[in-house]
């Protein structure tokens, strides 16, 4: 008799469709986990991108509810960067769905930094200081898939990616468009959506979590060279996780750089959660 797989709902980082993480998911499957994921947040008109992401959180809640109904039990909520934030908010607002939450390089913004972000957003200056300032100028098309691969292979943020993960990103993060001489390879994750997600980053997490405290354990895995951890700080993350923090060698995008090591770290982190046998 086979042992049933442990259900995970995984949420991707902004601009990277869930299928980009195929190598990671395959390794998690081999470790006894069944991963389900929304392919692209922000692209379903029923769940538009608005300030502080309430509809994106609701999309994750609705998706997770279906997984929980089928599994007959709460699930692990995992998320990378943006995905960690929506996972945490979903667990806070729908506590019966989450068994545990694992934040993958998703340092929680709180205190004076959150207040400052709120002021910047109110002054409509966020587009000049958020990652959206870069994403709104991102290249969106190439001659073909190989040209796209060569482009990203030489970008600093992608240079250390596992080659198989980069191939998956080209396969699932871009697609062919047009016919004949007009045929080209284009980004699948809408650049405008990516930028809007960055520019509507929640500044209300502190107050939301005070009103709706997360009732399940929360843990964190970060990259040793993560610029995001340094920018945001770790004070609120340490408070929420009660010190359940693990570091893995790599940048903010370490799941793409070292997917197999990341899968091992995820397994270790989840199995160390309180109440997990």
What are these regions (language model features)?
Residues 73-116:
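Conserved hydrolase catalytic core segment
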Residues 164, 173-238:
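Conserved serine/cysteine hydrolase catalytic core
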Residues 10-14, 80-81, 223:
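Glycine-rich His-Gly loop
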Residues 250-263:
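Catalytic histidine-centered segment of alpha/beta-hydrolase-like enzymes
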Residues 38, 246-251:
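Short glycine-rich catalytic loops that host catalytic nucleophiles or stabilize transition states
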Residues 3-47, 64:
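Conserved HGGG/HGGXW glycine-rich cap/lid loop of the alpha/beta-hydrolase fold
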Residues 36-78, 108, 117-120, 264:
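Active-site loop/oxyanion-hole signature of alpha/beta-hydrolase fold enzymes
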Residues 101-141, 230:
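Flexible "cap/lid" loop of the alpha/beta hydrolase fold
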């Amino acid at each position: 008799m086979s042992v049933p797989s442990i259900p995970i709902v995984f949420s991707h980082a902004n601009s990277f469709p869930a299928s980009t993480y195929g190598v990671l998911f395959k390794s998690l499957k081999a470790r006894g986990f069944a991963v389900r994921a929304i392919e692209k947040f922000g692209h379903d008109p029923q769940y538009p991108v608005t300030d502080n992401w309430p509809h994106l959180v609701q999309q994750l809640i609705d998706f997770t509810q279906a997984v929980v109904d089928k599994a007959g039990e709460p699930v692990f909520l995992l998320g990378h960067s943006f995905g960690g934030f929506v996972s945490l908010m979903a667990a806070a607002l729908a506590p019966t769905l989450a068994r545990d939450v694992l934040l993958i390089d998703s340092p929680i913004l709180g205190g004076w930094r959150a207040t400052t972000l709120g002021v910047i957003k109110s002054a409509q200056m966020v587009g000049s200081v958020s990652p959206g300032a870069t994403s709104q100028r991102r290249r969106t098309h190439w001659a073909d898939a190989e040209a796209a691969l060569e482009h990203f292979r030489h970008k600093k943020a992608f240079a250390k990616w596992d080659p198989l993960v980069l191939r998956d990103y080209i396969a699932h993060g871009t697609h062919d468009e047009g016919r004949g001489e007009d045929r080209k390879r284009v980004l699948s994750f809408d650049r405008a959506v990516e930028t809007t997600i960055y520019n509507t980053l929640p500044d209300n997490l502190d107050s939301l979590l005070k009103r709706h405290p997360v009732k399940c354990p929360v843990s964190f895995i970060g990259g040793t060279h993560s610029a995001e951890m340094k920018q945001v700080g770790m004070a609120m993350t340490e408070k929420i996780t009660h010190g359940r923090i693990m570091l893995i060698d790599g940048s903010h995008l370490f799941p793409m750089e070292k997917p197999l090591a990341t899968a091992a770290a995820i397994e270790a982190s989840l199995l160390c959660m309180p109440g997990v046998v």
